[in-house]
């Protein structure tokens, strides 16, 4: 079984420029609606099964939370569901927002 990898904001920028990544944001809906990384999908318990059924398991998947803590557990869970290339964004949305403000 594979495990997730850590990803810096700079690495995420490079991946998104290459358009080779799926991004899931596990923050609450209000936080997501107030700001999120372009192209991110707001993943929650209600849409998790649908997402897993529709997602490309072979494409890199980046999990984003508030500060990079909760995303680690979610990233490991997604690895266990069959995703091959999963990352947790270090510093979470806060770090991404600071770097892109």
Curated annotation (Swiss-Prot):
Organism: Shewanella oneidensis (strain ATCC 700550 / JCM 31522 / CIP 106686 / LMG 19005 / NCIMB 14063 / MR-1)
One Gene Ontology molecular-function label: thiosulfate-cyanide sulfurtransferase activity
Enzymatic class: transferase
Chief localization: cytoplasm
Keyword line: Cytoplasm, Transferase
Gene3D superfamilies in alphabetical order: Rhodanese-like domain
Protein name: Thiosulfate sulfurtransferase GlpE
Family: Belongs to the GlpE family.
Entry annotation: catalytic residues: 65 (cysteine persulfide intermediate)
Gene label: glpE
Taxonomy of the source species: Bacteria, Pseudomonadati, Pseudomonadota, Gammaproteobacteria, Alteromonadales
